[in-house]
Amino acid sequence: HIIDRCVDEMSGFPEERFEWIKWTVETAQKVTDSIVAIDSSDSKTIYAGLEAHDGSKNRPAINSFNLEDGRQELVPMAKEHNALLFANASGNAGMPQNAEERVENLTTCMEMMDVDDIPMEDRYLDPLVFPIGAGPEFGMHYLDAVGTLRERFPEVHLFGGHSNVSFGLPQRKLMNDVFVSLSIQA
């Protein structure tokens, strides 16, 4: 199990976020043996969380690295802290528009992780699930990317926010269950 900790909405002031992430990481480690994923849009906040993490209990995880400006520094940070590393398919120009961009962006992320010798079993790839209510093709973009990534990188973990697929639609539970099943089969 992995528990995600994010404090980005707690404060607009970096110093306050650093204190909040330290507190939330330390508190989570007091009440669970689960891996703590340190999640922020700010690399310095992630670093503060990694510094507060007690590595004698378990390893931390970083959520998440992508091709957006400033996120690449998380790769050597993961190596330095022996952290699991989550990568998502967001590109330097923004969100991926199709399956091919998802695969291309995550392949580039994989190459960057290779440079820092991040072990394959420590890599988690998120092709990004978008709501099909906003675009019916979004479901297939994700599923096609999952299939290609599974073939290309069979030893890495694939994951995603599967419940995003049904956002704004009725029968969400049924749709989510079907989408998870399709993702497993992809």
Explain the meaning of each model-derived region.
Residues 1-34, 46, 129-139:
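Glycine-rich, proline-tolerant flexible connector loops at the mouths of alpha/beta enzymes
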Residues 45-47, 176:
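Short glycine/serine/threonine-rich phosphate/pyrophosphate-binding segments
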